[in-house]
């Protein structure tokens, strides 16, 4: 939860923490620091207008980093203008909720995003997805194809290791694990 209004941040945190493992930050820079310290979120809920690094900059940074480009992002903001909404979606937001909002709406949006991702995993190629439902970049798709090709080629080798797969895709073991788990919901181990 990335929100500069401490009262609202605590409210969202308290309402989501019974269902999810939640971290909070007062701006985009703090959020990136939490991620840099090793905690990989399943979703980011961010305000638009914040000091130091606003929501658009945060989205852009997350989308341009291969290790975080798969993370769904929901933007919450007091801005109600269509152009702001369109801009957020173009930057890569998966959802947009105008303030004031009900916690029920936010939870429903989060659940919807997670459910759509599960559907993609269960039925690839059979799910109709609108751009605001899920963001999987070309690089993410290439990674999945590369992993699948490698697995098909090495499935019979009893000595194969996760480290070999990570080396093949050009990532560290932990980064690859987090990326594959975030994209597919499945562990590469």
Model-derived features: positions:
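Charged docking surfaces used in two-component/phosphorelay signaling
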Residues: 10-14
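Acidic, metal-coordinating helix/loop segments flanking the phosphotransfer/catalytic sites
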Residues: 24-43
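Receiver (REC) domain active-site loop signature in two-component systems and cognate sites
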Residues: 50
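A Lys-centered signature of the CheY-like receiver
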Residues: 97-99
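C-terminal output helix
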Residues: 101-110
